[in-house]
A protein has these predicted regions:
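Conserved short alpha-helical segments that host acidic/polar catalytic motifs at enzyme active sites
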Residues: 1-311
Length: 311
């Protein structure tokens, strides 16, 4: 694949099991902090790569705020971290975020063994121009989660460009202040089958204190996935269907919604949200139903899910 080829060209042999962190930063000392937390969590940095870009694709505001874009290749360093690789990836990223919370230019768009995020303050027609990697014939993907709009309720920033790590979001989360408060209140009582009690404390806070409503929803969805919650259950726990007004709903599905409603408050829009865990990809509209989402299956068996037919 392209990622392993880019390492091989530099004389680095990357094993089958590896992850790539995509990092925005203006201070390369941040990479040292990232490496330190990798080592704490039994992960090993094997290759650091500056992502090649073509700045002619950028407008002036994007160019003025352009971070350095770095890819860090990470592998498990012990048998235990190999068995808990995805958990250690998540824990490492959260600890880096906590440590560098005051560094407004530091952001990790993705750190995963399954997904990599190429995003920025770029017009959609220019993304392949800006990211030279995307033009390589060996760069293959099984799906793409793509978002054309920039943040509308917050100042456009590289780190706030969508998609986020697990979602792309059209609309607003109007319940976000209540959602954030409820997550903070309940987080101290949470138990996990994936993380130890001490690791859970190191993960907190679940939601980054800076960021948009989409950032908070992304943080919460990602937290559920990292703790072993099924992709579909996690999605519908946060963004439930209007089950109270669906008298013919399957009784088991209704029971699921009744149960989750006692434990978790809905993240209400109006919103249309696309989600992925690296294996599945899906799209939901919230129970208000005020943001469109349409799908088209083409003659060559491609599935497109968009907010508008003309997208």
């Amino acid at each position: 694949c392209f990622m392993r080829k880019s390492a091989t060209e530099k004389g680095i042999d990357v094993p089958e099991t590896y992850a790539v962190a995509m990092i925005f930063t203006k201070d390369l000392k941040d990479i040292d902090v990232f490496t330190e937390y990798c080592e704490i969590n039994d992960l090993k940095v094997v290759f650091v790569r500056t992502v090649p870009v073509d700045i002619s694709a950028l407008g002036q505001q994007a160019l003025d705020n352009l971070p350095q874009i770095i890819q860090v290749f990470v592998v498990p360093n012990t048998l235990m971290s190999s068995k808990r690789f995805d958990a250690m990836i998540y824990l490492t990223r959260k600890e880096c975020e906590h440590k560098l919370i005051n560094d407004k230019d530091f952001y990790i768009p993705s750190f995963s063994s399954k997904v990599i995020s190429y995003k920025g303050l770029i017009m959609p027609t220019h993304i392949k121009t800006f990211y030279v990697d995307l033009r390589d014939e060996d760069f293959k993907i099984s799906f793409s989660l793509f978002h054309q709009r920039f943040s509308t309720n917050t100042l456009p920033l590289w780190r706030l460009a969508q998609p986020f790590r697990a979602i792309a979001h059209n609309g607003e989360i109007n319940s976000v202040e209540a959602n954030r408060f409820n997550v903070e209140v309940k987080s101290e009582q949470l138990k996990s089958e994936i993380f130890s009690e001490s690791e859970m404390k190191r993960l907190l806070p679940i939601l980054q204190p800076i960021g948009s409503d989409s950032t908070s929803l992304d943080n919460m969805f990602e937290f559920l996935l990292a703790n072993g919650v099924d992709f579909f259950k996690a999605a519908r726990s946060l963004i439930p269907a209007p089950w109270q007004n669906a008298p013919h709903m399957d009784s088991n599905l209704r029971a699921f919604y009744e149960y989750t409603a006692t434990a978790m408050e809905a993240w209400d829009g109006p919103a249309a949200v696309s989600l992925t865990d690296g294996r599945h990809i899906g799209c939901l509209i919230d129970r208000n139903g005020l943001r469109p989402s349409k799908y088209v299956i083409t003659k060559d068996d491609k599935l497109y899910i968009t907010s508008e037919y003309g997208t």
